[in-house]
């Protein structure tokens, strides 16, 4: 069985927002990720772009999340996170590739963007291995904090 993306449920989102462990899925011991709460707020507005929980291909555990949202006409920004105990196994790259496969048939997406923190080169490696090209360094805001990040893009067939 390979890595699996499954839409985050309202029950999982509610638990995360209440600082509780989800009871409707089995999760890694160090779940949630640093982005779980932010992702959980997107469940009510979620569509084909997620958010999704990431299931380990070797264990019956959720080990992270991934999703995307339109940031402009034809442009989707994606974000992803894997719990520390499961990093370095290629799971984030595989999840990004799977999300790109799901986006591929869409005619309304021309460009997929990802921002990776300068202090997390492994995150940049994820999108690079998934086929993204480096665009430039930019300032991004995360939870009210301005960060310097690398911007990456993946051009779809529609683009």
Q: Where in the sequence are the language-model features?
A:
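Conserved beta-strand-loop-alpha-helix junction that forms the acyl-donor binding cleft
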Residues: 114-124
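Conserved active-site tyrosine of GNAT-family acetyltransferases
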Residues: 127
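Glycine-rich acyl-CoA binding loop
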Residues: 90-93
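GNAT-family acyltransferases
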Residues: 1-77, 81-85, 98-106, 119, ...
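Conserved GNAT acetyl-CoA-binding A-motif
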Residues: 106-115
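A generic structural signal for short
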Residues: 71, 88, 111-112
């Amino acid at each position: 069985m390979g890595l699996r993306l499954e839409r985050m449920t309202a029950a999982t989102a509610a638990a995360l927002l209440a600082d509780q462990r989800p009871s409707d899925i089995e999760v890694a011991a160090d779940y949630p990720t640093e982005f779980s709460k932010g992702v959980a707020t997107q469940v009510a507005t979620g569509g084909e772009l997620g958010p999704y929980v990431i299931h380990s291909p070797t264990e019956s555990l959720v080990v992270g999340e991934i999703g995307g949202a339109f940031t402009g006409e034809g442009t989707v920004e994606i974000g992803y996170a894997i719990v520390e105990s499961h990093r370095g196994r290629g799971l984030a790259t595989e999840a990004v590739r799977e999300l790109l496969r799901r986006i591929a048939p869409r005619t309304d997406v021309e460009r997929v963007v990802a921002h990776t923190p300068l202090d997390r080169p492994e995150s940049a490696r994820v999108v690079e291995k998934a086929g993204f090209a480096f665009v430039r360094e930019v300032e991004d805001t995360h939870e009210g904090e301005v960060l310097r990040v690398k911007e990456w893009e993946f051009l779809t067939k529609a683009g």
